[in-house]
């Protein structure tokens, strides 16, 4: 099976991965088309996807789970138009029934779904694929689009509000305080915004997207460039976290919510799958303790499902892992004690 119409195929002539921009970029505002209301919005997520898990983190940190409903896809991609031999796209599907299972997009393996495995149906429309939601929002003209999660869906207007995670988390942080369980938590405080913005920039290019530049590269030169920059940025994180508790200062911020999902996947997936094996995160003393610290922050662990994470990556891309074999380890313990309290004031 070829990469088809998926992100794996988004490479330049020199073999470098080039991520496409999100296409839905509406914002939640008090006086705009999309206002902050309880029960109006629905999130489509994957526990495997680091971008979607940013949004899940905010949902739990801000105490918005009673106000925004959620559907979670199965981790293993499927052919989204299985009866069309000319359409090779593989992507997210829903498998909400316990006892049901699916194979990978090339027909290999058997991977269970249902609530026992944190997989839900599409509670709004009964969609089979996330692609169906894009078709619904784009009047059937979605072919060629990257059918990504997270999706913030508006039940009133029956369309996608946003599929850009960085903007969704900003809005969840600031626009729903009237109904949020934690109204005082501000992950983008004014005094730290310059530091947060600076960190977000190099973390995104070097680490968040950097691991994909390594894993999806199709030339040695593109891989070498990406992996060198990735570890330069990880070394920078290690140095920074030797001086302060969090990546942008002394308190948990949006920058941590954006960095953490990549780090928590690194040793379990990226070291093998994306060839980022120069060094493990658990070999960085400050970074490893930081990962445990953030994970143990109330609300954050709800965004981590390692079965989803490993199952997705190792079973969804036949061009990278033809037999869909999922490695058994290393199964690191994120609940181990950490030493980050040494920075507490």
Locate each region found by the language model.
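C-terminal alpha-helical interaction module
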Residues: 1-345
């Amino acid at each position: 099976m070829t990469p088809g119409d998926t992100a794996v195929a988004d490479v330049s002539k020199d073999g470098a991965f080039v991520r496409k921009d999100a296409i839905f970029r509406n914002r939640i505002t008090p006086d705009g088309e999309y206002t902050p209301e309880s029960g109006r919005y629905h999130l489509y997520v994957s526990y495997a996807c680091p971008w979607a898990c940013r949004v899940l983190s905010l949902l739990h940190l801000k105490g918005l789970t009673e106000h925004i409903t959620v559907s979670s896809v199965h981790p293993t991609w499927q052919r989204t138009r299985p009866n069309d031999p000319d359409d090779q796209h593989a992507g997210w599907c829903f498998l909400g029934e316990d006892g049901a299972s699916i194979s990978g997009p090339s027909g290999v393996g058997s991977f269970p779904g249902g609530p026992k495995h944190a997989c839900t149906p599409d509670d709004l429309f009964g969609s089979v694929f996330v692609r169906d939601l894009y078709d619904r929002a784009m009047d059937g003209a979605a072919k060629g689009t990257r059918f990504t999660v997270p999706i913030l869906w508006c039940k009133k207007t029956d369309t996608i509000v946003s599929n850009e995670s960085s903007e969704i988390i900003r809005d969840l942080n600031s626009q729903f305080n009237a109904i949020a369980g934690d109204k005082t938590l501000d992950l983008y405080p004014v005094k730290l915004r310059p530091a947060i913005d600076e960190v977000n920039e190099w973390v995104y290019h070097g680490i968040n997207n950097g691991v994909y530049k390594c894993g999806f590269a199709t030339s040695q030169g593109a891989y070498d460039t990406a992996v060198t920059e990735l570890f330069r940025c990880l070394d920078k994180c290690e140095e920074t976290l030797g001086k302060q508790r969090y990546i942008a200062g002394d308190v948990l911020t949006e920058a941590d919510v954006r960095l953490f999902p990549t780090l928590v996947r690194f040793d379990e997936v990226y070291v093998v799958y994306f060839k980022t094996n120069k060094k493990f995160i658990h070999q960085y003393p400050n970074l490893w303790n930081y990962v445990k610290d953030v994970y143990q922050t109330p609300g954050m662990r709800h965004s981590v499902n390692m079965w989803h994470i490993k199952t997705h990556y190792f079973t969804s891309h036949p061009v990278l892992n033809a037999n869909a074999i999922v490695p058994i380890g290393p199964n690191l313990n994120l609940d181990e004690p950490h030493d980050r309290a040494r920075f507490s004031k």
